[in-house]
Regions:
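Weak global preference for isoleucine
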Residues: 10-12, 22, 32, 102, ...
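Catalytic pocket-lining loop regions of alpha/beta-barrel enzymes
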Residues: 1-98
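Mid-to-C-terminal alpha-helical segments outside catalytic/metal-binding sites
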Residues: 83-87, 91-98, 105-147
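Short, glycine/acidic-enriched loop or turn micro-motifs at the edges of active sites
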Residues: 18, 103-105
């Protein structure tokens, strides 16, 4: 309702809108994911809403990386979370998405270099222009960062 009522207001969706995976939502990712997709698609219809892509490494999302004997590799990270990134990128496109690290909170689950390497792997099939948007231009536009 807010995005529709204020179309000139830039709204930033943080951490994929927080698809929780602990507490009453533990082990329900397969059940929650379709509803999350539906809600995200509806939200993406508002051109003033942008998505920050990151934060899924947080323990509250239920992927369990923080409980593993070793932190995940970038490939392991991508294999468990790619569907979330693909969904957001499909609905919002690179023009309204930006990668973000959510450090230091993500540090409980993954190292900073491994996380950014995972983002590069997620974006590997995108054009150079789309990668520029995901890794810089969208954030610069939304946060009004100038050279």
């Amino acid at each position: 309702k807010l995005a529709k009522a204020f179309p000139d207001l830039i709204i930033i969706l943080n951490h994929f809108s927080g698809p929780l995976g602990i507490g009453p939502y533990e082990n329900k990712q397969a059940e929650i994911f379709p509803q999350w997709q539906k809600d995200l698609k509806e939200l993406s219809q508002h051109e003033n809403v942008y998505a920050k892509l990151g934060g899924l490494a947080m323990p509250v999302n239920g992927f369990g990386f923080h409980m593993q004997a070793k932190p995940p590799t970038s490939d392991e990270f991508v294999s468990k979370q790619k569907a979330y990134y693909e969904t957001a990128l499909e609905y919002f496109t690179s023009k309204r998405c930006m990668f973000e690290s959510n450090f230091p909170v993500d540090k409980a689950s993954i190292s900073y270099p491994v996380l950014w390497n995972a983002f590069k792997k997620i974006a590997k099939d995108f054009s150079s222009a789309e990668k520029d948007q995901l890794f810089y231009q969208t954030a610069a536009k939304v946060y009004r960062i100038t050279d």
